[in-house]
Amino acid sequence: MFESLKNFVKTNIEDLDGKELEISKEFKEHHNKDSKYIIKNWIFESQQYRKWRITKLDGGDKLQVFNTVAYPNFKSEFPILGADILWFGTSQKLLAIFDYQPLIQEKKYLQKYCSSLDFIKNQYSVFDNHKMKNIYDSKKYFSPWVMICRGNKLNLDRDLNNIFCSFVSNYLTINKLHQNNQFLDLEQIKNNQIDYDKYSAEKDPADKLFKTFFGETWTENFINNFLFTLNHNPLK
């Protein structure tokens, strides 16, 4: 599941003359003890994005997970793209969160880089779930227009692909239109991306999920050396 989403990201990175990077075997594909859960990962980079990662978790009919995060290079104050999608097969429930995660909460910054999410939300009302805003910290690395969906099989089949593609395409377009920094210098950008990784490594809700399936040792290594590498290694 979600192969089309992965391929869409990959194609767009290739259009930017980006490339897929080699990653260690332990992260490229990892199975839990009884192989009921399989996690696969990819990393890409381009001139515009120093790291664009994808994670897919295959739990068969019970659970399917897709996550992608794009880090602009340190010369760009552009937000970090973040998308989490979970499909719970037993209950037939979809949970998805999409956002252009801002490096700062300055009003003019948010308006310039993140406000176009509102246009996408207006097209897909199912992704405008105000009841779930307690699941994130609005004062940290989330925009006022974060898109949240708690949906069903119909939303999975009918809406998800279209809204994900709009979300990614819009992000790429905005980045092309705004090449000049207005709010942050290089050192501030780097420090904010480091803080983002530290914050995310501590707060990531997938931590418990991964520990349940793959154990604490592997999960800690995965979080610090694949997902959020700036948490403990500021130069990576």
Swiss-Prot record:
What is an example of a GO molecular function annotated in this UniProt entry? cobalt ion binding
Q: Which residues form a coiled coil?
A: none
**Which EC numbers characterise this protein's activity in its record?**
1.3.7.2
**What is the protein name stated in its UniProt record?**
15,16-dihydrobiliverdin:ferredoxin oxidoreductase
Describe the family membership recorded for this protein in Swiss-Prot or TrEMBL.
Answer: Belongs to the HY2 family.
Look up the signal peptide feature and give its range. none
Q: Which domain of life is it from?
A: Bacteria
HAMAP family (UniProt xref): PebA
Which reaction(s) does the protein catalyse, per the Swiss-Prot or TrEMBL entry? 15,16-dihydrobiliverdin + oxidized 2[4Fe-4S]-[ferredoxin] = biliverdin IXalpha + reduced 2[4Fe-4S]-[ferredoxin] + 2 H(+)
State the Pfam families in the record. Fe_bilin_red
- Which keywords does this Swiss-Prot/TrEMBL entry list? Oxidoreductase
User: What InterPro entries does the record tag this protein with?
Assistant: DiHydbiliverdin_OxRdtase, Ferredoxin-dep_bilin_Rdtase
What's this chain's function? Catalyzes the two-electron reduction of biliverdin IX-alpha at the C15 methine bridge.
Give an example GO biological process.
phytochromobilin biosynthetic process
Q: Which gene is the coding source of this polypeptide chain?
A: pebA
